[in-house]
Amino acid sequence: MMTRFAGMPQRIALTIVLVAFISALWLVVLAETAPITSSVVHKYTDPDTYLDILALMHSGVGYYEAAHEILLAHGYGLRSVFNWRTPAWMELLSLLPSIVWAQKLLAILTSATLLLAYRMIRAQGNIALAIPAIIGIFFSIVLLARDRGIVMSEVATGALILLSVVNYGNGQWLVGLLAALAALFIRELAAPYILICVAFAAYRANARELVGWALGLSAYFAYFSWHWIEVMQQIAPTDRADPNGWIRFGGIRFVLETAHFNGLFNLTPLWITAALLPAALLGLFAWRDGLRAAVTVTTYLCIFAVVGKPFNDYWGALYTPLLMLGLPWSIPAAYDALAPRRPSALPQLCDTPAQDNL
């Protein structure tokens, strides 16, 4: 059950743990004192938008026509293609009798992911780490998907990114690749994770996986090009552009609000999220199977410090399920950093590499 810190020089391991602890204290203070970036309460929210679009689709209206009507009626900017979601998730929802069916399907997908996550954690940990992780994962996704949350494509995308990560961790790169591509087709915000996966495949010189990525991304390019054409056909000369854009530099406060968009964290004050975020990152980086997840979470945190409107905190659903993998590992990570070193263990930096230990 040893983490990376067990074979690391103790001075370095202790420094990392200390930085995580100080970061947690700083984030707690920030959470309690900084102005809330999403303080403006909108009577009509993005979930309302997509519920109304879905209602029109159930009445027989096509996705793009329905999206144009609802977005225009509620003052959304229409001239940028990125204000229009790609249609995959809404088309899938429109095929189901109600959103309850979608919630059940997502629960089934999450349950399958839990089994794979359990196997992944048990490969290097024990049941005391695996059980809290899978419980946290289940509620972090399912509680977000209740009520109106299921229409938000970020929830399904985050579940698929998690499925991809655990399959890579179990050595099933093909399933991991397909799950990642499914996430991308549902929401283009999965693109940072896709680039991370391609980088991992290149580092490992996995030629077959790189071919798979070339084919998959070519298909996505065709799909998004078709989406672009459909959007351009809907835009009228009188349609307005969004005057603000997404580059807002919301900083650490907005990052915390995205991290708070988690089925479990949402039940607690923001300062709890602030305290647990560094612990989860510490656990992911210390866990020998956690590097892909750690890099993914860190990448999204950096992006959201710059990109995102104040009400886009729900983008956190893309990465917050991964935090549940890291939280249990923060405890053995701290123990390995603080425990006295055995002389025979000092020269050894790493044990035998795990499936996804890069």
Labelled PLM ranges:
Residues A117-S140, A159:
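Transmembrane-helix signature of polytopic, membrane-embedded enzymes
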Residues E91-L95, V100-N126:
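Transmembrane-helix motifs of polytopic, lipid-linked glycan transferases
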Residues D52-S98:
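Short hydrophobic/aromatic helix or loop-helix immediately within or flanking a transmembrane segment
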Residues P132-G136, W287-V306:
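Transmembrane alpha-helix segments characteristic
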Residues M1-P35:
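Start-transfer (signal-anchor) and selected internal transmembrane alpha helices
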